Design a protein with these regions (language model features):
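An anion/pyrophosphate-binding glycine-rich loop and adjacent beta-alpha core
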Residues: 1-106, 172-178
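Intrinsically disordered, low-complexity segments enriched in polar/charged residues with Gly/Pro
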Residues: 15-19, 111-114, 147-149
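Glycine- and aromatic-enriched mobile tails/lids
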Residues: 25, 32-52, 58, 73, ...
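Membrane-targeting and insertion segments and their boundary/processing signals
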Residues: 67-70, 105, 112, 136, ...
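FAD/FMN-dependent oxidoreductases across multiple families
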Residues: 99-135
Length: 180
């Protein structure tokens, strides 16, 4: 399956698709449609939030259009300082502040325009615990493997996947190579 990150930059075009960290939503920023209305529960899972954004833009026609024709929804980052106090966005999201400031967007005071971005392919090649597959001498770990994360991979799991299954697959492949 494909996993979409719900908040990829939709504007400016120079950073189209750039991932806006999940920490923004985790701190309380909410997605809003062109009418300024919240249309999905805050902190929904990635797949549910992505689907809701796509539906809001494509089916309900409540997206915000950029000068290039791209559509997205607002990510209300200024809400973070209202919830946690002034300076929270600067302190907790310095990389995001710098990234958008390069394009004269102050995410402390201005919302970001976002749209789901293809983020991770949850494999497709079925593996055994040692990383082996039904294809002779093929060992797999990481994004190519299937069945490890399910449909909704959580942040950080892919690193653990590569470490655990990569090590297992490497050992099993080395043993297999001795026999070849």
């Amino acid at each position: 399956t494909m996993q979409y990150h719900p908040t990829g930059a939709a504007f400016p075009e120079q950073i189209l698709g750039l991932l806006v960290t999940e920490k923004v939503r985790g701190l309380g920023a909410q997605v809003l449609n062109a009418e300024g209305r919240q249309f999905v529960f805050p902190r929904e899972t990635r797949d549910a939030e992505s689907a809701a954004i796509i539906r809001e833009v494509k089916e309900r026609h409540l997206g915000v259009r950029t000068p290039s024709g791209m559509e997205g929804v607002w990510l209300d980052s200024p809400l973070i300082d209202l919830i946690h106090g002034p300076g929270t966005v600067q302190r907790e999201l310095p990389a995001m502040v710098r990234q958008f400031a390069r394009f004269d967007i102050d995410i402390v005071r201005e919302t970001m325009l976002v749209y789901p971005t293809l983020h991770y392919q949850n494999g497709g090649i079925a593996i055994r615990p040692d990383g082996s597959t039904d294809i002779s001498n093929l060992f797999v770990a990481g994004e190519a493997s299937g069945g490890v994360h399910g449909r909704n991979r959580l942040m950080g799991n892919s690193l653990l996947d590569v470490v655990v299954y990569g090590r297992r697959a490497g050992r099993a492949a080395a043993e297999r190579a001795k026999a070849v």
